[in-house]
Swiss-Prot record:
Gene3D superfamilies: 6.10.140.1330. Changing residue 512 to G: Found in WKY/NCrl rat, a rat model of attention deficit hyperactive disorder. One of its GO terms (biological process) is sodium ion import across plasma membrane. Residues 1-20, 67-126, 186-203, 257-277, 328-333, 386, 451-465 are lumenal. It is a multi-pass membrane protein. Coiled coil: none annotated. The chain crosses the membrane at residues 21-41, 46-66, 127-147, 165-185, 204-224, 236-256, 278-298, 310-327, 334-350, 365-385, 387-407, 430-450, 466-486. Endosomal Na(+), K(+)/H(+) antiporter. Mediates the electroneutral exchange of endosomal luminal H(+) for a cytosolic Na(+) or K(+). By facilitating proton efflux, SLC9A9 counteracts the acidity generated by vacuolar (V)-ATPase, thereby limiting luminal acidification. Regulates organellar pH and consequently, endosome maturation and endocytic trafficking of plasma membrane receptors and neurotransporters. Promotes the recycling of transferrin receptors back to the cell surface to facilitate additional iron uptake in the brain. GO terms for molecular function: potassium:proton antiporter activity; sodium:proton antiporter activity. It is found in: Late endosome membrane; Early endosome membrane; Recycling endosome membrane; Cell membrane. This is Sodium/hydrogen exchanger 9. Its main location: membrane. The gene is Slc9a9. One of its GO terms (cellular component) is late endosome membrane.
């Protein structure tokens, strides 16, 4: 071996441990500084630089200091030694050095061009996170919180549009970015900046899929603060939530695309196999997440855990996390599973929780989401200097900037035109321009890019992704408020209090669940809400009509077993609305809440009197439900007792 080896002693190991504590402390102070800056921004209503942009700035400063103010601690770390006797890479390796045996663990494969001059810098290596930390620790709380805090009323009103943008729009963005980048790659080969065969079309599609993941967290935070039009907020929020899940599964499907003959040629069988993998993984992850939420709902319904809020909250958290881990263990996508687990938990399990657990779960995941987001954005700034294998290519970066803007335009404007053909409440041009402007890149694109940085194309993608995130967060995030003013989008809208806070009672939760429909998918909603109200809600929660009144007589034992005793009492008090949309009219079945009223006028008066007791309640006769010219009728639900 060339040179004398410096062996690690027990004293050196203690030094490394103390050094690790110092590095974690530095990162901790970085987060503290970020939190204080956020308070300063909120206190002075400073909207030209969002908190996430500030976190990235602090990360950049810290990374700059670590990069150039620290020296390598192990001069032999970058030296390559040949082991001709090994035919494969074992998970652990025992090495005898001067009669002392040392154990080494496998980390990753490193190509010759990946060996950095900073390879021996222990501080930079420690500040470079394992990519799996993002997917297994930091991303799940963010995605679960997005599903758990989903404002269902406006989301389901615009569900058809949201699904179109999330699924079809993401696919369009992926293909457009892939095609444009393939053209720039060919130009790079022609200019001699890239070798022919180093960057294939599948690599371009892979880059397109990860860059299709939008993360307008900065824009949405400003929207929430300014109370922007609820429909615009919901379209953008709903698209970003589902778009993340679609982009992750799409990226995985492209990465396992493997034709039999030429691995980089188009193969019809391999293409349809990838499509099948996409659908199977997405459906399986959806089922896994929903199943864990159903189990949680049943446990919280049929046990007395509500008497012990700490245990109830702990069980809720662990089962929700298990949805992610089980999906990953089964070869599915944990992010998709935990997203739909959060949506289902909010729809069913939340109603079974005690008041303490409702508050605790909401605050717990809100806090975890806040902390995880700021950790990720701080680390983005760090990664620009601590990542040791950046590849900056001006032509590739220029092509990526052009590609994401063109792809966003090909996504928003054509799909909005098609959606407006069938919508009563059109998506106006200023909404479309704002959605085009809000296509920021963030945590998901960064996590997908950093997960695989072994080859030169992947390293170039990661570097470019990092720069795109910086640009979109700083420029587009900071320009959100001026853009709202320029596009004349209304702010300070208070049409739906549920956009600002969760329902404050069981009755309001049921009302929000039922008071939603859209002409674009009325038949589907009529079937779903009827099934949900009559069967799923009574099975999984204490609300809804007793199963003894909705199931056939021969199901008597099962219905009595699954019906909660509280359901009989709640049946008389429940303020539940079921929207049924037909071709010519809308019949709304409405259960009375007051024992002294049966007319709509009386009901409205009582709702106004009780508004002080039930915060966030919405008058169903006000605002635009998006029902067009349908006639609204009120009918007493058959089979339900009417209070006199």
């Amino acid at each position: 071996m060339a040179g004398q080896l410096r062996l690690t002693s027990g004293k050196d190991e203690d030094h490394f441990q103390h050094q690790g504590a110092v590095e974690l402390l530095a990162f901790n102070f970085l987060l503290i500084l970020t939190i204080l800056t956020i308070w300063l921004f909120k206190n002075h209503r400073f909207r030209f630089l969002h908190e996430t942009g500030g976190a990235m700035v602090y990360g950049l400063i810290m990374g700059l200091i670590l990069r150039y103010a620290t020296a390598p601690t192990d001069i032999d770390s970058g030296t390559v030694y040949n082991c001709g006797k090994l035919l494969f890479s074992p998970s652990t390796l025992l090495v005898n050095i001067t009669d002392q045996v040392y154990e080494y663990k496998y980390q990753r494969e490193i190509n010759q061009h990946n060996i950095s001059p900073h390879q021996g810098n222990a501080i930079l290596e420690k500040m470079t996170f394992d990519p799996e930390i993002f997917f297994n620790v930091l991303l799940p709380p963010i995605i679960f919180h997005a599903g758990y805090s989903l404002k269902k009323r406006h989301f389901f009103q615009n569900l058809g549009s949201i699904l179109t943008y999330a699924f079809l729009g993401t696919a369009i963005s992926c293909v457009v970015i892939g095609l444009i980048m393939y053209g720039f790659v060919k130009a790079m080969v022609h200019a001699g900046q890239l070798k022919s065969g180093d960057f294939h079309f599948t690599d371009c599609l892979f880059f397109g899929s990860l860059m299709s993941a939008t993360d307008p967290v900065t824009v949405l935070a400003i929207f929430h603060e300014l109370h922007v039009d609820p429909d615009l907020y919901t379209l953008l929020f709903g698209e970003s939530v589902l778009n993340d899940a679609v982009a992750i599964v799409l990226t995985y499907s492209i990465s396992i695309y493997s034709p039999k003959e030429n691995p980089n040629a188009f193969d019809t069988a391999a293409f349809f196999q990838s499509v099948g993998n996409f659908l199977g993984i997405f459906a399986g992850s959806f089922a896994m997440g929903s199943a864990y939420a159903v189990v949680t709902a049943l446990l919280t319904k049929f046990t007395k855990l509500r008497e012990f809020p700490m245990l109830e909250t702990g069980l809720f958290f662990l089962l929700s996390w298990s949805a992610f881990l089980s999906a990953e263990a089964a070869g599915l996508t944990g992010i998709v599973a935990v997203l739909f687990c959060g949506v289902t938990q909010a729809h069913y399990t939340y109603n079974n929780l005690s008041s303490d657990s409702k508050l605790r779960t909401k605050q717990l995941f809100e806090f975890m989401n806040f902390l995880a987001e700021n950790v990720i954005f701080c680390y983005m700034g760090l990664a620009l200097f601590t990542f040791q294998n950046h590849i900056f290519n001006a032509l590739f970066i220029l092509g990526a900037f052009l590609a994401i803007f063109v792809a966003r335009a090909c996504n928003i404007y054509p799909l909005s035109f098609l959606l407006n053909l069938g919508r009563k409440q059109k998506i106006p041009w200023n909404f479309q321009h704002m959605m085009m402007f809000s296509g920021l890149r963030g945590a998901i694109a960064f996590a997908l890019a950093i997960r695989n940085t072994e080859s030169q194309p992947k390293q170039m993608m990661f570097t470019t992704t990092l720069l795109l995130v910086f640009f979109t967060v700083w420029v587009f995030g900071g320009g959100t408020t001026p853009m709202l003013t320029w596009l004349q989008i209304r702010v300070g809208v208070d049409l739906d209090e549920s956009l600002k806070e969760e329902p404050s009672s069981q009755q309001e939760a049921n009302k929000v669940d039922k008071d939603m429909t859209k002409t674009e998918s009325a038949q589907l909603f009529r079937m779903w809400y009827g099934f949900d109200h009559k069967y799923l809600k009574p099975i999984l929660t204490h609300s809804g009509p007793p199963l003894t009144t909705t199931l056939p007589a021969w199901c008597g034992p099962v219905s009595r077993l699954l019906t909660s005793p509280q359901a009989y009492g709640e049946q008389l008090k429940e303020d539940d609305v079921e929207c049924i949309v037909n071709q010519d009219e809308l019949a709304m079945n409405y259960q009375e809440q007051s024992p002294t009223s049966s007319s709509p006028a009386t009901k409205l008066a009582l709702d106004q009197k009780s508004s002080g007791l039930t915060l966030g309640k919405e008058n169903i006769y006000e605002g635009d439900l998006g029902l067009g010219g349908y006639e609204l009728k009120l009918e007493q639900t058959r089979g339900q007792p009417q209070m006199d």
